[in-house]
Each structure stands twice: as C-alpha cells, then as structure tokens.
Amino acid sequence: MATSSLTPGVSLDENGSIKLFNKFPFEGVEVKDISLVDYITIGNGQPLPHTAGRFQTKRFRKARCFIVERLTNSLMMNGRNNGKKLLATRIVKHAFEIIALLTDQNPLQVLVDAVAACGPREDSTRIGSAGTVRRQAVDVSPLRRVNQALALITIGAREAAFRNVKSISECLAEEIINAAKGSSNSYAIKKKDELERVAKSNR
C-alpha cells in the first residue's frame, strides 16, 4: 500500500484511488433506485466524511453532499450531541466495520440500499383552513425521501442504544443492515410502512 505525500495518513490502493476510512472502496457502489441517483452522492474521493459545511451555503445543495457525511450529521441531533462531529464520525466508522464483518459486503453499498429502502414514497399533508382540516395523500420528492430515510435510521439507532448494553455503533450497524434487507425489525422500515399506510387511507 502506497501512502500519498500530499495527504499524510491517506492510503491509496493499487489503482491509486482513495478509500473511505482507508478501508472501504468507492468503486462498484451503485444506487439501484433510479429516482434517487441524483440525490445519493457516493463519495467525492474523500477519506473522511467531513466537508466543513461546504454544502449548506445554497438551498438544495446538500443533495450533492456525500451520503456518509449526511448520516454522520444526522447522528449529531439532540442537543447534547450538537457539534460532536468527531464522536459521530467514530460511531459511523465502527458501525461500518461491524457491517463489513456481518455481511461481507461493502458497507457503503449496504448504506445506499438502506437509504433507498426506507425513504417513504407517499405521505399525507394537512389541507384546508382552521375550520375544516383534512389530510391528503401526496407524493414525496426524492430529496425528502433521502432526508427522511437518514433521519429514521439515526433515530432508530439512538432509541435502540438508549439504556442498552449494546453500543450505538452496534445498534446503527443493525439498523442499517435490517433496513437494507427491508426487514420489519428495522425502526426505519416500520415507520416508513406506517407513513405509507396512513397516506393510502387518505387518498
């Protein structure tokens, strides 16, 4: 393994390409859901999921942000975790190592499959003024599907780890694996099915 002189500590493989966390290759990862291809960005050749807020300057630019960084940022929710990017990055790294051990697949591909699987395609919104309010089923945009999928995955992992002997890395790994399989053991899949069921009843 050669080491780049430009970026100390970054390992390059035989083809000279950078790996995520110096372990997981970006090559071969694909988005199988055609509607989400433009909204799930698989790496910009960066070894760490950290761009220092580069994608927040304009509306909708976050769609071009690396999907692992978006997952890391979602983990920083709840006031006590705000700004702890290093802690969140470490959690994601350990979760990816667990996913690689349990599935023998590239964790990046498993995450992409999980995000595609647990983003709700249909939701319901409130229509009408204060007097008469009813709910109407609406289609969900691809960007919101990705946003909701990431939020549901991280909320599920956080709730599973609360008052549990398992670490949050283990819970996050389990949540991502179950979501990628479409298993009902996943919090994100359960919530997605619930949202779609409510929307179907309000068509």
From Swiss-Prot:
Annotated PROSITE patterns: RIBOSOMAL_S7
Parts forming coiled coils: none
Subcellular localization, as worded in the UniProt entry: Cytoplasm; Nucleus, Nucleolus
Gene Ontology BP term (one): ribosomal small subunit assembly
Keywords recorded for this protein, A-Z: Cytoplasm, Nucleus, Ribonucleoprotein, Ribosomal protein
Remarks, miscellaneous: There are 2 genes for uS7 in S.pombe.
Family (UniProt): Belongs to the universal ribosomal protein uS7 family.
Protein name, entry field: Small ribosomal subunit protein uS7A
